[in-house]
C-alpha cells in the first residue's frame, strides 16, 4: 500500500518545498523504492497554461500533454518517474470537476459544500495520482495560513486519519532567519508556523528548517521541544552552491532513515553515487563557455527554469562551466547586436506575442551571418525561419500570422489540424480558447540522416514534448528549401516541420519542440550536449 508524505511550507513562500521534496524522493528512490510526486496548487486557474510567465514562471509540459507547475520539472529532474496529468491539479480544476458532477446530478440533489464535496475530490485526486507507488510525496502549494490552501490542508488532515499514522506523515518547511546584529538564528517564526498548523489539526512529523546559516544543535533541540517533533526529525537545510547537493545533505542527517522506519518499509541503503558524480562535475569543470540567451521574460528567470537547468546539465556532461549571458530581446531591438559580441554560442528560447520578436530575428541574423553556433527552441525556430525568408529568400515582409495577419509571406501560421501521439486528429481555429488548445505533449519526430540534429541524437526517430499553436507554413516551404534551408526533422506523420538547419554553418539547429523538458542532471540531453560542444569548438577558433 502507498505511503504518503505531505509537504507544506510556512513563514514565507519560495523556501524550496519542491526541491526539498524532490531530494527526499531521490534518496528514497536510491533505496530501491517506487516513488512518485504530486503538486497541489491552490490558485483558481484550471492550469497555468494561460498565466503570465512574469507571475507564474515556466509552464512545465508533461509527457502526456499537461500544462503544469514548474515544480514538476524539478520532480522529473530528481527522480526517474515520469509525471503525468494526474500529478498536478489546482483549486480551479477541483471546482470544475465538482460542478460538472453537480450538473450531471451525481450528488442527488445535495447542497454542494467545501466539506465534504471539495475535500473528497481533492482526496480522490491524491489517491489517483499516487497510483501504486511505495511512497507518494504530496506538495501543497502556498504557505500555511493562506486562505486559498485551507481546503487542501483539511483534505490531507482527513486523509491522514483515513489511511492511518503508519501510512501518512507530514513534512513542514519553515524559515529560521539569521539576525546579523544579534549573531544568531531565530526559532520563533518556526514555532508560530507549527502552531498555525496544529490549530487546524495537523501535527508535523518532520521539520525542514531553511536558513542561510547552519542551525546549531541547541536551536534544533529548542525547535523540537516547542513543536512536539522528534529532535532527529528537525533537519537543518542551509543554502548550498548547487541544488544537486541537497539529496546528500538530507541523507547525511538521516531523513530517509526516519521515513523508512516510520513507515515500516523494507529496503536497502541509499546509493547516492550518481548524485556525487553530478556534484563533482558541476563544481569542478575543466572548460568554460559563454552562451547568450536572448528571451522575452528576463525579468523572471523562472520563466526559463527547465532551459537554464538543461544548459547546466549539458555543462555537467561536458565538464564545462556554462556561463549564460541573459539578454532581453527588446534590448537587441533598441541597442543592437553589439550585446552579442564575444559569446561562444546563442540560444533563443520560446515565447508568445509580438513584443521583442524583432530583436530575436536580429539575433538569428547575427548568429547565421557570423557563423556562431545557434540553438532555437519553439519560437526560436519560428524566428529562424522568418529571418531566413527575409534575408536569404528576399521576402522582406515575411512573418508569422501570430504577429502580422496581413503579411504576404506568412512563413509561420496557425496549426489548424494535426495528429496527436494517440493517433487522434486535433483541430483548432483562430476562435478557439487559448487554454488547453495547443499542440501539447510528447510527439514522434523523424530525423534526417547526416544532419547536425541526427548526429546529436544518434537515431532516426526521437520523442520530444511540444507546446505551441503555430508551425512552419508548408505552402511556402518549397521556396525556403530551394534557397538552402534544410528541413532535418519532421513530425511522425511527416506533415509538420520540426527541425531546420542553416546551410554553410558550423552549427545552426532550430527545433519546434522543447528538449529542455526531458533533460536531467544525471543523463543530460543530447541536443544541449551537442550545442555546448559546438560552443567549445567556436571558442577554440578564437584562440
UniProtKB/Swiss-Prot annotation:
SUPFAM superfamilies: Class I glutamine amidotransferase-like, P-loop containing nucleoside triphosphate hydrolases
Pfam families in the record: CTP_synth_N (PF06418), GATase (PF00117)
Enzyme class: ligase
Annotated residues for binding of ATP: 14-19, 71
Chain spans, region Amidoligase domain: 1-265
Stretches of the chain forming a coiled coil according to its record: none
UniProt-listed Enzyme Commission number(s): 6.3.4.2
Activity regulation (record text): Allosterically activated by GTP, when glutamine is the substrate; GTP has no effect on the reaction when ammonia is the substrate. The allosteric effector GTP functions by stabilizing the protein conformation that binds the tetrahedral intermediate(s) formed during glutamine hydrolysis. Inhibited by the product CTP, via allosteric rather than competitive inhibition.
Any single Gene Ontology cellular-component annotation: cytosol
Keyword Metal-binding in annotation: yes
Residues that coordinate or bind L-glutamine: 351, 379-382, 402, 469
Superkingdom, natural source: Bacteria
Gene Ontology terms: biological process: 'de novo' CTP biosynthetic process; pyrimidine nucleobase biosynthetic process
Annotated pathway: Pyrimidine metabolism; CTP biosynthesis via de novo pathway; CTP from UDP: step 2/2
InterPro entries (alphabetical): Class_I_gatase-like, CTP_synthase, CTP_synthase_N, GATASE, GATase1_CTP_Synthase, P-loop_NTPase
Amino acids binding CTP: 13, 146-148, 186-191, 222
CDD domains: CTPS_N, GATase1_CTP_Synthase
Residues annotated as catalytic: 378 (nucleophile), 514, 516
Keyword field: ATP-binding, Glutamine amidotransferase, Ligase, Magnesium, Metal-binding, Nucleotide-binding, Pyrimidine biosynthesis
The family this protein is said to belong to: Belongs to the CTP synthase family.
Described purpose of this protein according to its UniProt entry: Catalyzes the ATP-dependent amination of UTP to CTP with either L-glutamine or ammonia as the source of nitrogen. Regulates intracellular CTP levels through interactions with the four ribonucleotide triphosphates.
Subunit comment: Homotetramer.
Further details from the record: CTPSs have evolved a hybrid strategy for distinguishing between UTP and CTP. The overlapping regions of the product feedback inhibitory and substrate sites recognize a common feature in both compounds, the triphosphate moiety. To differentiate isosteric substrate and product pyrimidine rings, an additional pocket far from the expected kinase/ligase catalytic site, specifically recognizes the cytosine and ribose portions of the product inhibitor.
Designated name of the protein: CTP synthase
